[in-house]
Amino acid sequence: PALTASVPTGGMLLFGAVREAPERRADDPALLNSVLVLDEKGAVVADYDKRRLVPFGEFTPFKRVLRVTKMTVGDIDYVPGESSAPIQLVGLPAARVLICYEAIFPRSGDDEAGWILNVTNDAWFGMSAGPHQHFASAQLRAVEEGLPLVRVANTGITAIIDPYGRVIVKTDLNKDAVIDGGLPVALVEPTWFGKHGNSTFLVVTLLLIGVSRISLMFPDE
């Protein structure tokens, strides 16, 4: 009821949540790190489950072999979500969701997203360089795709970033603040990276190898 009351008329509330993974045995429970979208009636109209999990933070790799526990509270591991599809929001372009450190990875797969939503908990970084590095990674995702990015961080840095990576507005670390701003428009044409993805790096690598071989064949006298 409290969450529903905070949804504006005709609007939506997007928030992070931990929920139980479905279809698990009673003796093998697991959790999902999720973003849920609530409408004014209190119904969940869209969701996304984090796909890239933090090793030793959200799950323990090779758990039976290493016999170590997570660095975070709780014994139950998280499991990755199954879909990377953008979430559909009434009155807005489809949104690609990146939860926490998913923002440090380039996109994988094609979709029809019109903007990027990055929801993160950076509190554990404290007043270090971590939040600033994490924020810079999110900026890079906007530039790669030519898409605006809205970043929501519980302790900052929360921001709206345009498709060129320029910061429209942002908050400071550990400061109470509210951002009220419009969503920048995505680039008309997809970027090279948006079209070709990680194959870009293969092309650049081959070009560099070719230039190096030519330089060896025709050294300067």
Predicted features, each with a name:
Residues P1-E221:
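Enzyme catalytic cores with a strong preference for nitrogen-chemistry domains
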